[in-house]
Amino acid sequence: MVPESPTVAHLSQVIHDVTAPAFLLGALAGFISLLMARMNRVIDRSQALNAIGDNDDVKGHLKSDIPRLKRRAALLNWAIFFSTISAIVASFLVIVSFASAYLSLQHEYVVGFLFILSIGFFVTSLLSLALETRIALHEFDHFGGK
């Protein structure tokens, strides 16, 4: 038994309804790109500091920054993880919206819950980025940068 095909008006309404999650997906893609760039910078700095010899009296003090870089990398890793989960949930939200329209199912509560869940993961990711940024700025002050 094939369900009744949705009307053009109904599909148009579904497309309208998934506009916010689609914009959220675009924002998350850009945000994950930003997080990856920050992570690459932290990794590059860690590799440079690890390359400093233990007997280097001139640059040896810079190695004290390695634990801070590890903490930043961990926070960025969590931010990337939560952003990715947010994007997956937002994608699932779009799928549920269209599948529900095709199958003529009520989906308002599920879609609302998925949107709240996706935004919650995004906020968690933003909080991880805020903590990482705070550590990065503290690090800058610690080494006398102005």
Q: Whereabouts are the PLM-identified features?
A:
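Cytosol-facing regions at membranes
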Residues: 1-146
